[in-house]
Amino acid sequence: MTQANLSETLFKPRFKHTETSTLVRRFNRGSQPPMQSALDGKNVPHWYRMINRLMWIWRGVDPREILDVQARIVMSDAERTDDDLYDTVIGYRGGNWIYEWAKQAMDWQQKACQEQDAMRSGRYWLHASTLYNIAAYPHLKGDELAEQAQALANRAYEEAAQRLPGSLREMEFAVPGGSPVTAFLHMPKGDGPFPTVLMCGGLDAMQTDYYTLYERYFAPRGIAMLTLDMPSVGFSSKWKLTQDSSLLHQHVLKALPNVPWVDHTRVAAFGFRFGANVAVRLAYLEAPRLKAVACLGPVVHALLSDPQRQSTVPEMYLDVLASRLGMHDASDEALRVELNRYSLKVQGLLGRRCPTPMLSGFWKNDPFSPEEESRLITTSSSDGKLIEIPFNPVYRNFDRALQEITDWINHRLC
């Protein structure tokens, strides 16, 4: 089936799809205090979703493109679930978040199909994949339209990979007790086996969101990147997130000696946000298999155990947490009790001495991840490194931090 036909098949105009903001029915929603963070964007008044400009621009989206799509959503007079929230238009039609971002992605997909130059075509496919992922954001379980956008994002990503430098392999890993999981191994030019970073992404992102990380930071240093969707989303959607948050990544890590392109004696893990929960667990449970673990804005204890901090987090992020935990109609109290069990300190891991070198980067006044969180990680390691990342200028400092983290990982893998 051609890309165009697939798009038409998946996105038939219908108006009965459940609107994203209604998928999680928590009982006592509160008011949203203003909040901004480098990794998550900010909760802009009159938007259900957090507007994550830094990460979208970092992934290659032009700021003007973001504003154009937002403008189309704002200007729509179609029926909304909540008249006060622009991005709650009901049904797949003009003004609906998924519709507008997918429409933008389809324009780039069409350009990719028409482009004769393979490299340029690959760039267009990659851009289409990024936009489809934004369409599906924040990837709540049961969001049919978002799942269709994710399918298109993955297809576009595969098309891009065939045309861009290096090589990409789609790999399937068996996991006892359930469905196998699909991972993407990104390999730089040259002969393997390669030192490899196992990417542990955030709960509101897909594994295909990290190509920029590979291309700009790992590939130039000859490092491969292996990505895997977090439990309950994407290719790992049949797995529920549990307190054993590292289960899927752990099975993949154990299988690496059987992957000929990976030097399984030189593997590190890198965790963004809740992905750090996975990475730090691996540092304790699989120390002999890991040379290093790096974290950025980690969510390993404070947000999971502190009701006060949870009350400052935007509704969308709490919905993401509830969705991943399979608690679609839970009260905030029930959600808090469950989240506490995911704290690595409560689990008895963090605070104990860990032989794996661990680095953690943080931003001052980060509502999701205070400085103490990163300090707890680095002081638990026998070889810890703490990095404070200045907020402004946000893009330049983010790039500088990633360069420093990659150099640290590279040094540990050598």
From Swiss-Prot:
EC number(s) reported in the record: 3.1.1.1
One Pfam family named in its UniProt record: FrsA-like
The UniProt record lists the keyword Hydrolase: yes
Signal peptide: none
Record carries keyword Hydrolase: yes
Job of this protein: Catalyzes the hydrolysis of esters.
Protein family per UniProt: Belongs to the FrsA family.
Name of the featured protein: Esterase FrsA
Source species: Salmonella typhimurium (strain LT2 / SGSC1412 / ATCC 700720)
Gene from which the chain derives: frsA
